[in-house]
Design a protein with these regions (language model features):
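An N-terminal assembly and electron-transfer interface module characteristic of large anaerobic redox
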Residues: 1-309
Length: 309
């Protein structure tokens, strides 16, 4: 398919990417969109196992997903793939009955959501309103369910078809799924040149630029983290520098092939945040990830005896 362009998300120039230019406005929106997507995932997975009305969490997710699409793509410049890769699709859940659908509609009406056609004027307003509505969603007053984290190779971690719908299985078995966000992977990629400059004599200018890049990326989700922490209900993303420090107790930060040390760091972060049960999912042929994933399990179990990986 010679006419099909492949756009590489790489600063190393592996692909020429003809006709594709990353502008500052595009980069700004891309970072905001990743932050918003990570936040939506965190909100949905936290409340869905406890929803008072079956289907209300998915309906609320759909509402804010549409608001997000309208905010980031007001002129329909980009194709909307949200129906193709839909996080609220649960294989094994029966469709809502008319009575259940009515109760879900009533539950969302009680939240006082803005009209679907109303424009959101700022990213801060979009995130604040989204968090507030998920925090206000009526939940069952039951004991916290066992929490199961999902980490691994970036495709297998996020794509339901690649991980055999792990989230659906976890929730069907009466547990709560926890999936760390996508933004952290980009922070991991940005952090690696800093280590290489210090220990391998690589470019100090590149390392300095990466330090500033990390500060910039972290700034994009700073307000989201603040609002999530105010609720006291949702898991918070960790600083990539803190994750690197914690991973150093198990392996060298020089392990940067594939997901590298970041894979181990995510498992440590989950365990220390009350998620001792972890699915570490890899493609069969991804040897670097088997080394820093399965290869680290023995040491993680030694340091964290309550872990179940």
């Amino acid at each position: 398919f010679p006419k099909v362009a492949v756009v590489a998300l790489s600063a190393q120039g592996f692909e020429a990417n003809p006709g594709w230019k990353i502008t500052l406005p595009f980069l700004n929106q891309a970072l905001q969109a990743v932050c918003y997507g990570d936040m939506l995932s965190t909100l949905l997975l936290r409340v869905r196992p406890y929803e008072a009305e079956r289907g209300s969490a998915n309906a609320l997710y759909q509402y804010w997903n549409k608001k997000g699409v309208a905010f980031f793509n007001p002129k329909n410049k980009y194709a909307d793939l949200s129906d193709t890769y839909n996080m609220d699709e649960s294989c094994g859940n029966d469709p809502l009955t008319p009575e259940e659908a009515t109760r879900v509609h009533d539950a969302l009406t009680q939240l006082g959501l803005p009209d679907e056609e109303a424009k959101v004027r700022s990213f801060t307003r979009l995130t604040d309103d989204t968090i507030a509505s998920f925090d206000a969603l009526q939940l069952r007053d039951i004991k916290r369910k066992p929490r199961v984290g999902i980490v691994g190779e970036i495709l297998v971690k996020f794509q339901p078809d690649a991980n055999n719908h792990a989230i659906d299985v976890i929730e069907r078995e009466g547990c709560e799924a926890v999936v760390p966000g996508l933004l952290d992977f980009f922070l991991y990629c940005t952090y690696n040149p800093i280590w290489r400059a210090e220990y391998l004599g690589r470019s100090s200018k590149v390392a300095w630029a990466c330090e500033r890049g990390i500060d910039l990326i972290e700034h994009y989700r700073k307000h989201i983290v603040k609002k999530l922490s105010e609720t006291g209900k949702f898991i918070l993303p960790a600083s990539i520098r803190d994750m690197a420090n914690s991973a150093e107790s198990v392996l060298s930060i020089g392990n940067s092939c594939g997901e590298g040390w970041f894979l181990t760091a995510e498992m440590i972060e989950l365990i220390e945040n009350g998620v001792p049960n972890i699915i570490c999912a890899q493609p069969f042929a991804c040897l670097p990830n088997h080394v820093t994933g399965k290869g680290m399990i023995k040491e993680l179990r030694r340091q964290y005896p309550n872990s179940n990986i």
